[in-house]
Every structure is written in structure tokens, then in C-alpha cells.
């Protein structure tokens, strides 16, 4: 996808804010300085400010300019913000907070999937599961298949509001999976069995078993995460 100039500046400043170049409470450079630095117009910079405000990374103060917002006000459900934070630094507090969201959301998603999944949905989940099995010693390919698996489960719920959370949930899952992948004989068979158990529960339309399978999967992921942090 080709980015326009506004988008490119948003990404640059957003990443600089998240990385700590501009700390919360400090001011961004003046509008005129940003225009000069990025070789662009005031209208473009004002569009950038509006975008960063929507992500709650900055606050505009009358006659004073743009200031970095406190971290606890940042919009972590904005997929750009979440991805920038996860790319920039491993923050155990953020991972822990988002893992709590997984515990809240994913068991319900699993139950609804068991109640609503179509034959086409089941084929998508099974395809991703088979790719996980086939690539269980290839970290990158395995994690991509794992993400596809969970996305397919979410898609099978057929809830348009939940779909809006899909990218944020996937970003979190990707960050967790990349840090908790363990291809050894002590862990990989258990991981694959947990994913198969969830698929089987969904396939058999067993909501209770699907919910329990999701809880078991999250507990295993959380345990592995704690072991490496």
C-alpha cells in the first residue's frame, strides 16, 4: 500500500513518541519547525496533529502547540499505536494487561464459534491448524499459521463489532506468540494438542469444551510468557 505524505509523517512522529524521543508532557516542535523539517505545508502538519490526537498520543493546548499525552491515555486499541509500542520495546505490563483482555474475550469467542461456525469456517480453521502442524519447527511459518488459526476462529463468530477488534487482537497475539514459541519436544506437542482440542470442540458444536479449551490455551501461553520474563 502506498502511503501519502501525511501518513508517512504520522508514522514517523508516532514512532518517535512511542520510542521516548518526545516524553509525555513535553512539547512537539513548533508547527513551523515541523513544516521545515518534513518539507511540507502547515495544512499537512495540522492533518498529522489531528491523526495523532485521534490516537491520543498528543494533546493540543491553545496558543502553546502539541504536547505528548500521558502513556495511560494512549489508544492501545488503535492498531498503529499498539504495533509501534510492541515493536519498540517489550513491556511486560502491557503484555499482562492485554493478556487479561485475552482471558476476557477469547473464551467467549470460542463458545460462540462452536455455536455459529459454518462448514466453510471449519475448513479455514482446519487449514490453519494443518499448517501449524506442518511447520511446527519453523518459528515464523508456525506463528503466521497460528495467527491465521485464531483469526479464522474469530471470523467464524460472524460478529461485525468483534471484527473491528481483530487487528488489535492479532497484534497482541503476534507479540505473545513470537516470545512464547517453543519448538522443543516438551512444549510443541502440547501446543498443537491444545489447538486441536479447540478445533474439535468447535467442530462438534460443544460450547463448554470450546470455552475450556480456550482457557487452557491462554493459561499455557501465560505460563510460557512468565518463564521468559
Task: Mark where each language-model region is.
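Short linear motifs at protein or domain termini
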Residues: 1-104, 111
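Hydrophobic side-chain positions on well-ordered alpha-helices
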Residues: 16, 135, 154-156, 201
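Short, cationic motifs built from Arg/Lys/His that form the positively charged side of catalytic pockets
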Residues: 27, 42, 46, 102, ...
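Residue-level recognition of alpha-helical structural elements
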Residues: 91-94, 118-121, 138-146, 158, ...
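Secondary-structure edge/capping motif, primarily at the C-terminal ends of alpha-helices
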Residues: 112-113, 132-139, 202
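C-terminal all-alpha effector/ligand-binding and dimerization domain
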Residues: 126-133, 148-150, 160-163, 167-229
Amino acid at each position: 500500500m502506498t502511503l501519502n505524505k501525511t501518513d508517512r509523517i504520522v508514522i514517523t512522529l508516532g514512532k518517535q513518541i512511542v520510542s521516548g524521543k518526545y516524553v509525555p508532557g513535553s512539547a512537539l516542535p513548533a508547527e513551523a519547525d515541523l513544516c521545515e523539517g518534513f518539507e511540507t505545508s502547515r495544512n499537512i502538519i495540522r492533518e498529522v496533529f489531528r491523526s495523532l490526537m485521534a490516537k491520543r498520543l498528543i494533546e493540543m493546548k491553545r496558543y502553546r502547540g502539541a504536547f505528548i499525552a500521558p502513556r495511560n491515555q494512549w489508544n492501545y486499541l488503535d492498531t498503529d499505536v499498539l504495533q509501534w509500542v510492541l515493536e519498540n520495546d517489550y513491556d511486560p505490563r502491557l503484555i499482562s494487561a492485554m493478556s487479561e483482555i485475552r482471558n476476557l474475550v477469547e473464551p467467549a469467542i470460542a463458545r460462540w464459534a462452536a455455536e455459529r461456525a459454518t462448514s466453510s469456517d471449519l475448513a479455514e480453521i482446519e487449514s490453519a491448524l494443518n499448517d501449524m502442524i506442518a511447520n511446527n519447527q519453523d518459528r515464523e511459518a508456525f506463528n503466521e499459521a497460528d495467527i491465521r488459526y485464531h483469526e479464522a476462529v474469530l471470523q467464524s463468530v460472524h460478529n461485525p463489532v468483534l471484527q473491528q477488534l481483530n487487528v488489535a487482537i492479532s497484534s497482541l497475539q503476534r507479540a505473545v506468540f513470537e516470545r512464547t514459541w517453543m519448538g522443543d519436544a516438551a512444549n510443541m506437542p502440547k501446543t498443537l494438542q491444545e489447538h486441536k482440542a479447540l478445533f474439535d470442540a468447535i467442530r462438534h458444536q460443544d460450547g463448554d469444551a470450546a470455552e475450556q479449551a480456550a482457557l487452557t490455551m491462554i493459561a499455557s501461553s501465560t505460563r510460557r510468557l512468565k518463564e521468559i520474563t
